[in-house]
Amino acid sequence: MKRKVFFKNISGEGLSPLEIYLKFLDENNSYFFESVEGGEKWAKYSIIGLPTKNKINLGNNPLDEIDAFMESHQTEKIDGLPDFSGGLVGFFSYDTIRLIENRLRVSKKPKLDYDEISLMISNEIIVYDNYEKSLFIIVNDYENNE
């Protein structure tokens, strides 16, 4: 399935990215990314992921499953939008290294009280352009390629 991107650009004058995020806050299902260039300078975009309950379920080969998901859920690139316009967002725990480093695979898998990898499918985001003081409201939908 190819993801189709729909967006609207509106003025963000008088708003801060943090204010926008706090209006949509969901502790477990939203996020706020600030971009920084060179470790010091604020970059162009702040990205706010709107709450979602859509998560990717992973089995015994999570890295292969993530690759397959990414391959089957390509997003069109639109000039003028940031490179990230939605997709997988989440975390890989420290223990995920066992899936990458062969010599660590023999170690006993620890019992975790949390997911080793947790990824949500972020289809609705707000991007704040820090230079232009404008907002991109972005929604991804899927079109069936069959």
Question: Which residues fall in each region the model found?
Answer:
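Signature of the chorismate-utilizing enzyme
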Residues: 1-146
